[in-house]
Regions:
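Non-catalytic connector elements of ABC transporters
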Residues: 28, 37-124
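Short, flexible active-site loop motifs that bind/organize anionic cofactors or intermediates
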Residues: 2, 11, 43
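Short, solvent-exposed coil/turn linker segments
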Residues: 8-11, 32, 49, 115
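C-terminal boundary and immediately downstream tail of ABC-type ATPase nucleotide-binding domains
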Residues: 13-36, 45-47
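ABC ATPase "signature
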Residues: 3-8, 15
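Residues located in well-ordered beta-strands
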Residues: 8, 20, 34, 66-70
């Protein structure tokens, strides 16, 4: 085995040095360099944590994607969603309340967005 990163748990979670480390603690979505270029005109692979993926928000974010819901897990105060767009898999959390209620169904298409400040470049 090889040690990928030595750091505090908080730094490993917030600033992983590789896709392996990003996926080791918590949930994340890894966007490959090819997909980053094709869909976002971005030149590096990156990870995005589900808590930073906004659902059906304004398209004024740095990254926007329309994807289909492929899995829904009710977890009490939130829904954990898995979304697909071609080869891209995105994990997102949806926190329902009376002002943002949307219909969640497998196969439904929804708009996703996130800001550059919330991604981690993986340089892989």
């Amino acid at each position: 085995g090889k040690i990928e990163q030595i750091d505090t748990p908080i730094n490993i979670y917030n600033k992983p040095k590789s896709a392996f480390v990003a996926d080791f603690i918590g949930t994340t979505s890894i966007i490959t360099k090819n997909d980053a270029l094709s869909y976002f005109n971005y030149s590096s692979s990156f990870s995005i944590r589900p808590e930073f993926v906004m659902i059906n928000q304004s398209k004024n974010s740095d990254f926007n994607l329309t994807a289909n819901i492929s899995d829904i897990q009710f977890q009490g105060s939130l829904y954990k969603l898995l979304l697909e767009k071609d080869s891209i898999l995105i994990n997102a959390y949806y926190y329902p309340n009376s002002s943002n209620s949307i219909n969640l169904e497998i196969g439904e298409s929804i708009n996703l967005s996130w800001d550059k400040i919330n991604i981690t470049d993986l340089n892989e």
